[in-house]
A protein has these predicted regions:
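Intrinsically disordered, low-complexity Ser/Thr/Pro/Gly-rich regulatory segments
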Residues: 1-67, 72-218
Length: 218
């Protein structure tokens, strides 16, 4: 039997998709992007009201990250008025994309590597989660998942077990894709990297609960 919590998570997941479609009528792209970013943040805060969520850049001894849409900070983090936050105060660094491109995955993988390296140098137990939340991707689902180590088998009509040798984005900890398409036949999916660095694929609805669980576990 499906739990009420799962039904509510599916409701939230559908709301995110509907908000994306509703905002498509806005022609000013920065405004459209801001609305989507705020909607995702609000849905996370609805689940965990005490979280400190920001957007901006991370700073660490002369190094700055790229501007990012979603930063989860520790409770006692220094905030200020300039959207600049100390790397040591960060718990999650997440890009939000309407239609993620291959180049954006590459850029995120590069900045993630630097974030992970710097965090561990200061504190071996401090792992900053880095990932992407996207509504869709320019490449097909099969192409994207192949780059995360999951090959689609036509005979089995499903994905094979994770293959680390095929994974080219080893610094990205997670990917959430609502996988919105014009025909509405595609299903959302999530890739999560485990403690050992291997990826796990979630494609049974609702997948959003796996994303929400990050904020509960850390």
């Amino acid at each position: 039997m499906v739990s009420l919590r799962n039904e509510l998570d599916l409701y939230i997941q559908e709301l995110l998709s509907l908000q994306f479609k509703a905002s498509n009528g806005i022609t000013h792209n920065p405004t459209k992007g801001t609305l989507r970013e705020k909607f995702i943040k609000q849905e996370v805060l609805n689940q965990y009201p005490a979280l400190l969520l920001k957007s901006g850049i991370l700073d660490d001894e002369g190094w700055q990250s790229s501007q990012v849409d979603f930063i989860w900070l520790k409770e006692n983090a220094r905030v200020g008025n300039f959207n600049v936050y100390e790397l040591s105060d960060c718990k999650m660094f997440m890009e939000i994309k309407s239609s993620a491109k291959h180049s954006e995955f590459k850029d995120l993988n590069t900045v993630s590597e630097e974030i992970h390296r710097r965090a561990i140098e200061k504190n071996p137990e401090h792992h900053i989660l880095t990932g992407m939340f996207c509504y869709s991707t320019e490449a097909s689902e099969k192409t994207v998942l192949k780059k995360f180590g999951f090959k689609y088998d036509k005979e089995l009509q499903g994905y094979l077990n994770y293959d680390a040798e095929k994974d080219i984005f080893k610094e990205i900890d997670f990917l959430v894709s609502l996988n919105i398409s014009e025909d509405n036949e595609a299903s959302p999916y999530m890739v999560k990297r485990d403690f050992f660095g291997n990826c796990v694929l979630y494609n049974n609805n609702p997948i959003i609960n796996n994303f929400f669980n990050y904020f509960k576990a850390i």
